[in-house]
Amino acid sequence: MNAVGALENHDLGALRAQSLLTTQEWSVADLDATRALARALADLDRRGIRTPLCPDELAWAVFFDQSTRTKSAWAGASSRLGMRPVIVDGSSTQVSHGETAVETGAMLGMNAHARGIRHDLILGEGNTFIRDVQQGIDDYLVATGDPRQVPIVNLQCDVDHPTQSIADLLWMEDNLGDLAGKKIAVSWAYSPSYAKPLSVPQGLITLLTRFGADVTLAHPEGYRLTEETMSAAESNAAGGGSFRVVDDMDEAFRDADVVY
C-alpha cells in the first residue's frame, strides 16, 4: 500500500484543530496518524501534486529565539497547504513591552487560523507562555462567537521540541523500520544557552520510549533533565521499551543503532 492509501487506516479527523504542545499529550493513535499524513503529503509533493487543503488561511508564527530549519519548515509546510505564512521576531511584539501572553493570544486570535511559537530560552517559562497564548485565543473566540478553531504548534520550548522529535521518529522508522528493540543513544552536553538544548533530548526520550525503543540517555554527571520528563520516559518505557541513564559516552554508544 502506498503512503496515500495508508491514510485509510487512520482517523485523520481526530487531528483537526488539535494543538501540539508536547508529544506526551497526544495518543499513540494520533501520533501514528500524524506520521502517516506526513508521509502521504511528502509523497504527493515529490510527485508534483498540489495539496492546498487550507487555502488563503493565515499561518502565524512568532520566534523568541533564533531558528533556521524550523522557520523554513513552517513557511514551506504552510505554503504547500495553501496557507499564507507570517513569521515574526518575538522582540518586535508588544510582549517585550509588558503585554501578557493571554493578551497576545487574544490579539492574534482575531486573524490567525494556526499559530506556531518558539519560546525556549528560559527554563520554566516557555511551555507556560504557549499555553497562556492558547488560553487567550480560546477566550477571544468564545467571547466573540467566532466559529474558527486556532490550534497552536510548539516550535520548541523549554520542555519539548515536538515537531523535530516527530520528524526524527519518522526518519528512524523510514531507515530502520519498527523501532521495537532498537538501541538509541541520546546524548547532550553543555551549551552556553543551558535551557535551550533540554527540549531536544527531553522530546526524544519521551517520544521514542513510547514506540518500543531501548533508549539510553547520556550526559555529563550532574546535567540531569527535568524530573517530570525523566519520570515520563520511565513510565513510557514500561509499555515495551527500556530507558536508562549513563554518564559515559562509550557505554551509551556501544551497539547502538542510532546515536543522537
Over which residues does each language-model region extend?
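Residue-level preference for short coil/turn positions at secondary-structure junctions
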Residues: 16, 54-55, 148, 180, ...
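Glycine-rich phosphate/diphosphate-binding loop of Rossmann-like nucleotide-binding domains
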Residues: 64-79, 173-260
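Generic structural signal for well-ordered alpha-helical scaffold segments
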Residues: 39-46, 169-174, 205
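Alpha-helix termini
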Residues: 44-48, 136-147, 175-178, 235-240
